[in-house]
């Protein structure tokens, strides 16, 4: 019987898709009809409900109203349409927006409510939500429901939607160290994230290759660690702009400063921070991970992370902790002496000592933290509210077994392993990402409730501003729908039709999103 209900629901979804072909991600509940209403661009407006907690002056929604009016109709004037069918003349010139709780000057967080309802019928055109963040998601859905006839008339169908995200953390990671991404590329990415209902920008700011974050506490890190200290850095103003731009789109900024590995770019600007490597009994002239044996290391980290904690308002920081190469530590006699003094018998214990000390430092600043899975694998003692991000896809531990182990230990988990978008293969590889079920591991309902979402990751070894957009979009949309929509929304044919239309909508909005199959868009990219 359950299988029969699922089959019927998929048939219904396919039928509805004919009326809502560009809806992405698919809502939790939707009813839509052939009855349609005309939208008049010259007169259309967004308006606050008289009882809404948010009113004019709420910058989050005021700015969103301007954005979506421009996305829908542009800035030009439109002639009044003429009709042969009287049914088409019933117009909808106002979308009324009602919010229960005004959070207009706040930042979104992991607990933010994004539910909304959208009702379009003869009597009303109403978007209702508990928060401004839910209203933002509803505005995006509304914009996708509007369509234009061959004659140039805008319509919207009679529709009822009740929608909410399946997971609260739906992220995109950008790596701005291996290749510097201009500020405009980051802001453009935030725009398209909002179109896909992503709500976390995981900013992998620094790595071995470069240190583009401009630190006001340790300016030499940027001067000596960036590719170019004038053109290839993110100033304090740049960072503030990213954070505010994201906030206005309901997106959190999760900043990552990965240590003790992935820190070679830190060395030139912070003498004594990295471990000197030895070749036999002599210094080799090279450096390895952060030196965990010196008190000065922890003084430095304490000062730097105090700054970072003040710059980035989100409760969580990402502290990395992955891929620590022990070779240099093994070669260094001072490290060996420190380990002997501490009673450490292997280098995982040394790594754990460093990470545990860093976690304690960050905790003192009233921050939570996200770490890569190695921190859990190496049995570092962490707070119960730590979030573990799973990224390793290969054996010996398959990523679903890792999810099982992490949640069994009582920790919250994020999944990224199957969603590395920098890895490209010929053909519609978005389907592989779409088919991933984040809860497809053996575990109790309590374990599965600890999976709070996941992230699509775009690492930068072979990605810069020349190929970021087409490599990211619309492929990341597969992850967006998996993290937003119901676990029953899995039909590939249904997804293909909608994603094809959504890709064309992205192109219409000026996004150079790559095609997912043979075909065309009514408005091609060079025409935008």
UniProtKB/Swiss-Prot annotation:
Signal peptide start and end residues: 1-22
Biological process, per Gene Ontology: adult walking behavior; carbohydrate metabolic process; cell morphogenesis involved in neuron differentiation; dermatan sulfate proteoglycan catabolic process; ganglioside catabolic process; glycosaminoglycan biosynthetic process; glycosaminoglycan metabolic process; hyaluronan catabolic process
Disulfide bridge map: 58-104, 277-328, 504-521
EC annotation from Swiss-Prot or TrEMBL: 3.2.1.52
Cellular compartment(s): Lysosome
Short name of any one Pfam family annotated for the protein: Glycohydro_20b2
Class of enzymatic activity (EC top level): hydrolase
GO molecular function: acetylglucosaminyltransferase activity; beta-N-acetylhexosaminidase activity; protein heterodimerization activity
Keywords, alphabetical: Disulfide bond, Glycoprotein, Glycosidase, Hydrolase, Lipid metabolism, Lysosome, Signal, Zymogen
InterPro entries: Beta_hexosaminidase_sua/sub (IPR025705), Glyco_hydro_20_cat (IPR015883), Glycoside_hydrolase_SF (IPR017853), Hex-like_dom2 (IPR029018), HEX_eukaryotic_N (IPR029019)
Pro-piece positions: 23-88
Catalytic center residues: 323 (proton donor)
Catalyzed chemical reaction(s): Hydrolysis of terminal non-reducing N-acetyl-D-hexosamine residues in N-acetyl-beta-D-hexosaminides; N-acetyl-beta-D-galactosaminyl-(1->4)-beta-D-3-sulfogalactosyl-(1->4)-beta-D-glucosyl-(1<->1')-ceramide + H2O = a beta-D-3-sulfogalactosyl-(1->4)-beta-D-glucosyl-(1<->1')-ceramide + N-acetyl-beta-D-galactosamine; a ganglioside GM2 (d18:1(4E)) + H2O = a ganglioside GM3 (d18:1(4E)) + N-acetyl-beta-D-galactosamine; a ganglioside GM2 + H2O = a ganglioside GM3 + N-acetyl-beta-D-galactosamine
A cellular component annotation (GO) from this entry: lysosome
Description of how activity is regulated: Addition of GM2A stimulates the hydrolysis of sulfated glycosphingolipid SM2 and the ganglioside GM2.
Family: Belongs to the glycosyl hydrolase 20 family.
Function text: Hydrolyzes the non-reducing end N-acetyl-D-hexosamine and/or sulfated N-acetyl-D-hexosamine of glycoconjugates, such as the oligosaccharide moieties from proteins and neutral glycolipids, or from certain mucopolysaccharides. The isozyme S is as active as the isozyme A on the anionic bis-sulfated glycans, the chondroitin-6-sulfate trisaccharide (C6S-3), and the dermatan sulfate pentasaccharide, and the sulfated glycosphingolipid SM2. The isozyme B does not hydrolyze each of these substrates, however hydrolyzes efficiently neutral oligosaccharide.
Protein name in UniProt: Beta-hexosaminidase subunit alpha
Native source species: Mus musculus
